Swiss-Prot record:
Record EC number: 2.7.7.13
Metabolic or biological pathway: Nucleotide-sugar biosynthesis; GDP-alpha-D-mannose biosynthesis; GDP-alpha-D-mannose from alpha-D-mannose 1-phosphate (GTP route): step 1/1; Bacterial outer membrane biogenesis; LPS O-antigen biosynthesis
Record's subunit section: Homodimer.
Stated role: Involved in GDP-mannose biosynthesis which serves as the activated sugar nucleotide precursor for mannose residues in cell surface polysaccharides. This enzyme participates in synthesis of the LPS group B O antigen.
Protein's name in the database: Mannose-1-phosphate guanylyltransferase RfbM
Cystine pairs: none
Enzyme superclass (EC): transferase
A GO MF term: mannose-1-phosphate guanylyltransferase (GTP) activity
Homology family: Belongs to the mannose-6-phosphate isomerase type 2 family.
Lineage, highest ranks first: Bacteria, Pseudomonadati, Pseudomonadota, Gammaproteobacteria, Enterobacterales
Length: 479
């Protein structure tokens, strides 16, 4: 029997700041090796008989998801865009409704996974999923309980009930994150598992329980899916209908109340990578138990996580620290207090600082840009456009733009004119002028963009689809 993977990719990963940002959260990061967490989540399904994955994500991340799927040779036409966040119960309901509408299998088994988890033992993972198959096929709602390796206060727990089959249990209860003493008792008892947030069930089984236990969520999602707007690779859900949907997790909405919940134990080196300390736990270490990534010299140091993006970092005689350097931010924290990193993100949000939103180097489907300098009434960016790529015609009311080509050749549309701009040449785009840019060449186009004007906000962009032969595919992705 085949599975339909449903990958939940909507989180923000704020506890892994400054690497994880709102516009580029942790599920799109490569924490070990070259592949991102999202890509690894999908690749580990290779030994299972699965259909092309359904990915549920924030509208803002749609092109990141599509690009990362294409990089691992997966179809990118099953991406469900949540117009607003409503937690996991509605998100899974959207996938279940879509699966019943579109799947060749009339009632597929949905394998629901988070995009930002790490599983080190893929054989054990596959074995647990296969073991759960018979229960899910017969109408049970299966969750996977991680066998604890220690007393942990950072996870919720599942208490197992009666044995209903070989290494399969009824769910007795879901338990919130405990204090350290209670976590110790759970660990000693052997009856509690970490709540992984991974599930296996038939689409109809989930929707039937949702309809019975949380009818408002069911009705709102049913209506939202009834007004789907296909958009290239993306499945756009009706915003007004979905906004009326209550926000609730699958645990609260369904799993804690259903009579059909089953827990399958799993020992697979699982981590939700919810903090820098948990990332240190799963990373390869040197003989002093340091994790060193980048250009780093460490002497008489132990138990540290040190990451450098583009600077030389030297450390002497320090222990139990997390040091993370990016182009625009530096984090120094005790490994025992890294859960408080979210307070930094909250501070940045309150003060409307860009460091919580995105990196200085920002990747787009057409290429990337890097902010070089900014100040009152000006912004300077270095832009790289991939061969054959383009961004659509647009206009700004309050700013002008100067483009200076460093390498390659640009095809520029300005008003009714279309012309080529070559290396060491420049062009000027006045305010209120329709303009577009394309790289017609075989090599990357690199240029400097200087924005100047009284207002440089990203909401001063009027995009004009289908103008000057430019497709609408990259609309909203220029900025």
């Amino acid at each position: 029997m085949s599975f339909l993977p449903v990958i939940m990719a909507g989180g923000t990963g704020s506890r892994l700041w400054p690497l994880s940002r709102e516009y580029h959260p942790k599920q799109f990061l490569s924490v070990e090796g070259k592949l991102s967490m999202l890509q690894n989540t999908i690749k580990r399904l290779a030994s299972l008989s699965t259909e092309e994955p359904v990915v549920i994500c924030n509208d803002r991340h749609r092109f990141l998801v599509a690009e990362q799927l294409r990089e691992i040779d997966k179809l990118a036409n099953n991406i469900i865009l949540e117009p607003v966040g409503r937690n996991t119960a509605p998100a899974i309901a959207l996938a279940a409704f879509c699966a019943l509408q579109n799947a060749d299998n009339a009632d597929p088994l949905l394998l629901v996974l988070a995009a930002d988890h790490v599983i080190q033992d893929e054989i054990a993972f596959t074995k647990a999923v296969r073991h759960a198959e018979e229960y899910a096929a017969n109408g049970k709602l299966v969750t996977f309980g991680i066998v604890p390796t220690h007393a942990e206060t950072g996870y919720g727990y599942i208490r197992r009930g009666e044995l209903i089959g070989n290494d399969a249990y009824a769910v007795a209860e879901f338990v919130e994150k405990p204090d350290i003493d209670t976590a110790g008792d759970y660990f000693k008892s052997g009856k509690y598992y970490w709540n992984s947030g991974m599930f296996l069930f038939r689409a109809s089984s989930y929707l039937n329980e949702l309809k019975y236990l949380s009818p408002e969520i069911y009705k709102a999602c049913e209506k939202a899916v009834g007004h789907i707007n296909p958009d290239l690779d993306f499945i756009r859900i009706d915003k007004e209908e979905f906004m009326s949907c209550p926000s609730d997790s699958i645990d609260y909405a369904v799993m804690e109340h259903t009579q059909h919940a089953v827990v399958i134990p799993m020992s697979a080196g699982w981590s939700d990578v919810g903090s820098w300390s948990s990332l240190w736990d799963i990373s390869n270490k040197d003989h002093q138990r340091n994790v060193l990534k980048g250009d780093i010299f460490a002497h008489a140091c132990n138990d540290n996580y040190i990451y450098s993006e583009d600077m030389f970092i030297s450390a002497i005689g320090v222990s139990n620290l997390v040091i993370v350097q990016t182009t625009d931010a530096l984090l120094v924290a005790n490994k025992d207090t890294v859960q408080d990193v979210k307070k930094i993100v909250d501070y940045l949000k309150r003060n409307d600082r860009n460091e919580y939103k995105q990196h200085q180097e920002v990747f787009r489907p057409w290429g990337k840009y890097n902010v070089i300098d900014s100040g009152k009434n000006y912004l300077v960016r270095c832009i790289t456009v991939k061969p054959g790529e383009k961004f659509v015609a647009q206009m700004h009311h309050h700013r002008a733009e100067h483009w200076i080509v460093l390498s390659g050749t640009a095809r520029v549309t300005k008003g009714e004119q279309t012309y080529m701009v070559s290396e060491n040449e420049s062009t000027f785009i006045p305010p209120n002028t329709i303009h577009a840019l394309e790289n017609p060449g075989m090599t990357p186009l690199k240029l400097i963009e200087i924005q100047s004007g009284t207002y440089l906000g990203e909401d001063d962009i009027i995009r004009l689809e289908q103008r000057s032969g430019f497709s609408k595919e990259w609309t909203n992705e220029r900025s």
